[in-house]
Design a protein with these regions (language model features):
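C-terminal, active-site-flanking charged/polar segments
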Residues: 173-193
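Canonical bilayer-spanning transmembrane alpha-helix
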Residues: 163-167, 173
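Short beta-to-alpha loop/turn elements within the nucleotide-binding domains of ABC transporters
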Residues: 158, 170, 176
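Conserved catalytic segment of ABC-fold P-loop ATPases
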Residues: 161-164, 178-180
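Flexible, glycine/small-residue-enriched loop-and-beta-strand segment within the central core
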Residues: 15-20, 25-158, 187, 193-195
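Terminal amphipathic alpha-helical/low-complexity segments used for targeting or macromolecular assembly
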Residues: 1-10, 23, 111, 186-285
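Short, well-structured beta-strand-loop connectors
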Residues: 148, 166-167, 183-184
Length: 285
C-alpha cells in the first residue's frame, strides 16, 4: 500500500495506487482508505473532516470540498468494504457535507454541485429477503452540469440527466431522464423544463457592463487600490487579466482584485478556475 501523511494536520491516506495531482490541497482531520486506486486531479481541494472508505476513488480536476460546519463529507458506509465500492467524480465538482454510500458504484459527472447534506444511497430495504422483501443494490449515475439542492436524498438505481436542477429537500427514487429540467419534491417530480434564453451580442455586452457596475459597487465597501475594469464582449479586462467569458479562458496576471472579481462572478454562474482557487482576501473600510 502507498501512504500519504501530514501529521501536523492529521491527514492519513492509504491506497494500493496513489495518484495525487499538482497543487492539490488538503484540510485537517482527513482519513482516506482505498484498497485500489485513489486519484485526485490537479488544483483540487479536499476539506476538513473528509473521510472515505472505498475500493476505488477517482476525483477529477478542480474538485472543491469545503465543509462549513463541524461535519465533513463521508464516503463509504454500508458495503464500502466490498469490491463494488467505487466512486468516480468528474472535473469542477463542488460538495460540502453529506454522505455517499458505496454498496454499488457511483458516478458523478463534470460541473456538478452537491449542496449541503446531500445523501446518495445505493442500497435498498432494511428488511430481510427471507421475509419476501426485495434485494436492492444499484448504481447511481449523475450527469454533467447538475445541481442538487440542500438535504436531498438520491436513492439506488437512479440516473440523472445532464443539465438538471433538483430542488432542496427532495427524495429522488426514480431516474430523472429529461435534460434541461427542474425537479423537486418527495418523490421528485418534473416541475418545468429549462429554456435557455437567447441573448444578442448587444444584450450580452450590457449584461457584462451591469456585472462590472455591481462589482464596482461591492468594491466601494473595501479598502482597495484604484483598479481598471472594462469589457468588450466576450472579453473582460480587469487590471492585467484578460478573461473570455464565453469559454472562461484567461491570460495575464492575477492579483487580489482579480481574485475578488472571480469569486464575485461565480455567484452569477461565471466560474473562472485558476490553480490557486477562489479567494476573496480584501479588508473592509
Amino acid at each position: 500500500m502507498e501512504v500519504y501523511q501530514d501529521f501536523a494536520n492529521n491527514v492519513h491516506i492509504t491506497a494500493k495506487e496513489l495518484n495525487i495531482g499538482n497543487n492539490v490541497r488538503f484540510g485537517k482531520d482527513i482519513k482516506i482508505n482505498v484498497r485500489g486506486t485513489f486519484e485526485v486531479g490537479n488544483n483540487s481541494i479536499i476539506g476538513d473532516r473528509f473521510t472515505a472508505n472505498a475500493e476505488e476513488l477517482i476525483i477529477g480536476e478542480y474538485f472543491y470540498n469545503g465543509p462549513t460546519d463541524l461535519r465533513g463529507m463521508v464516503i463509504g458506509g454500508g458495503g464500502a468494504n466490498f469490491p463494488y465500492a467505487k466512486l468516480k467524480i468528474g472535473d469542477r465538482v463542488v460538495c460540502h457535507t453529506g454522505h455517499i454510500n458505496l454498496a454499488s458504484p457511483v458516478t458523478i459527472g463534470n460541473d456538478v454541485g452537491l449542496s449541503h447534506d446531500v445523501d446518495l444511497i445505493t442500497h435498498g430495504f432494511w428488511y430481510s429477503v427471507l421475509e419476501g422483501y426485495p434485494r436492492v443494490f444499484k448504481d447511481i449515475n449523475i450527469g454533467n452540469n447538475v445541481i442538487v439542492g440542500w438535504k436531498t436524498v438520491i436513492m439506488s438505481g437512479v440516473t440523472i440527466a445532464d443539465n438538471t436542477v433538483i430542488g432542496s429537500h427532495s427524495t429522488v427514487t426514480k431516474s430523472l431522464l429529461e435534460s434541461k429540467a427542474i425537479y423537486a419534491g418527495s418523490p421528485a417530480k418534473l416541475i418545468k423544463h429549462i429554456t435557455k434564453p437567447t441573448l444578442t451580442l448587444t444584450e450580452k455586452h450590457h449584461m457584462l457592463e451591469s456585472l462590472i457596475a455591481d462589482f464596482k459597487d461591492l468594491m466601494s465597501y473595501y479598502d482597495v487600490p484604484e483598479f481598471s475594469i472594462n469589457a468588450q464582449y466576450p472579453y473582460l479586462y480587469i487590471n492585467q487579466l484578460k478573461i473570455n467569458v464565453d469559454d472562461f479562458s484567461y491570460e495575464g496576471e492575477h492579483d487580489a482584485i482579480t481574485d475578488a472579481f472571480r469569486d464575485f462572478a461565480r455567484r452569477y454562474g461565471i466560474r473562472i478556475y485558476v490553480p490557486h482557487g477562489f479567494k476573496f482576501n480584501l479588508t473592509r473600510k
